[in-house]
Curated annotation (Swiss-Prot):
Gene designation per UniProt: yqfB
Gene3D superfamilies referenced in this protein's UniProt entry, alphabetically: Hypothetical protein
UniProt name for this protein: N(4)-acetylcytidine amidohydrolase
The reaction(s) this protein catalyses: N(4)-acetylcytidine + H2O = cytidine + acetate + H(+); N(4)-acetyl-2'-deoxycytidine + H2O = 2'-deoxycytidine + acetate + H(+); N(4)-acetylcytosine + H2O = cytosine + acetate + H(+)
Physiological role: Catalyzes the hydrolysis of N(4)-acetylcytidine (ac4C).
Keywords (A to Z) from UniProt: Hydrolase
Family, per entry: Belongs to the N(4)-acetylcytidine amidohydrolase family.
Enzyme Commission number(s) from the entry: 3.5.1.135
GO cellular component: cytosol
Disulfide bonds: none
Lineage start: Bacteria, Pseudomonadati, Pseudomonadota, Gammaproteobacteria, Enterobacterales
Transmembrane helix listed as a keyword: no
Amino acid sequence: MQPNDITFFQRFQNDILAGRKTITIRDASESHFKAGDVLRVGRFEDDGYFCTIEVTGTSTVTLDTLNEKHAQQENMSLDELKRVIAEIYPNQTQFYVIDFKCL
């Protein structure tokens, strides 16, 4: 079995598959992805494969510059997005936005 290239929490799987979640916000450890990359996607909890995505763009963002567009692309409110990012990446302020589409 091939390894997954990127993982998402299981709670995001349905939104990704339905096209409601079209970005992911990551820390520096996952800043190497670039437009055109095709990635196998798995669940964080069990590493089970659930789809393949293509990276369509990348950019940088800080917690303070997250906006309503980011929230819409994550399929959540801006307050919820900021809370989730702060929980996943405590004490960090610089992040990398990975735009993607399911293949």
